[in-house]
Amino acid sequence: MKGNIYSLFVLIAAFFWGTTGTVQALAPESATPLAFGAFRLLIGGSAMLLAVWISRELHVKNWAWPLVFLAAVCMACYQPLFFTAVKETGIAVGTVIAIGSAPIIAGTLEWAVLKKRPRNSWWIATVLALAGCWLLFSDSSNVRIDVAGVLMALGAGASFAGYTLISKAMMKTQPPRATSAVVFMISAILLTPLLWQLDISWILTPRGLGTSLYIGLIATCAAYFLFAKGLTGVPASAAVTLSLAEPLTASLLGVFFIGEMLSPSSWLGIALMMLGLLVISAAPRKQKTAEAAHMS
């Protein structure tokens, strides 16, 4: 049961992330992907840092600072790559490729670098979810494929996988919420200088401020605190596979709020993705039950 709670934390986080593409589409047209991503980190990172400071969780003694900065670089790269991909190739395709590629990259890195072979449930769930991803955007008459956008989405997927693996390693010895807060604040600092080169007047409009606050406070601060908590109870590769709930959410929001069209095969893809998420969500409980039986 406890393992399923950690999986639920990741799923809720992924749901919030899945709203980012739709929220970006609702932002003013002058809001560039780079500026939107930078404000997301700035607002979200500030809120996270304030929260851990108030709760007195901000203890940074004996931290693995090289890993902290590497995780921050991954997150700083993820923001502009993801939002540009969504703008260039659509909400559904951009999100599906970005997050759909991440489980493969994360599982491969976890196996190659950490010598930790993913569980059988991960393979089954990832195959189901990725097959669902492919079906979700395989009908070219309903979506647009932009090569540059696809490459940026793949880069975003690699950045997210790297962030997850590094965060998982750090959270073995560092407090999850404080680690996430510091990583996001450093990421914001890395991207903030770029704001001076962009037109950011849009954030002073009601739509600009509203979408920025939502993306920073809900889809970043709340979501990544939940994700950090989830990482303490599930493997990094499983967490990234669970994150496939993000494109599932994004696709449904794209249909119901933005007017994007999905074919019957795309709906079949959604069903496969949901099945994959159920498989990986149930895995921690089964593993724990097996361990308990073995100990008895």
UniProtKB/Swiss-Prot annotation:
Residues spanning the membrane: 8-28, 34-54, 63-83, 89-109, 121-141, 147-167, 183-203, 208-228, 238-258, 261-281
Subcellular location: Cell membrane
InterPro entries hit by this protein: AA-Vitamin_Transporters, CO/AA/NH_transpt, EamA_dom
Keyword Cell membrane: yes
SUPFAM superfamilies tied to this protein: Multidrug resistance efflux transporter EmrE
Cellular component per GO, a single term: plasma membrane
Domain of life: Bacteria
Keywords: Cell membrane, Membrane, Repeat, Transmembrane, Transmembrane helix, Transport
UniProt topology in membrane: Multi-pass membrane protein
Domain EamA residues, every copy: 15-138, 158-282
One Pfam family linked to the record: EamA
Gene3D superfamilies in the cross-refs: 1.10.3730.20
UniProt similarity note: Belongs to the EamA transporter family.
Name the record gives this protein: Uncharacterized transporter YwfM
Lineage, broadest ranks: Bacteria, Bacillati, Bacillota, Bacilli, Bacillales
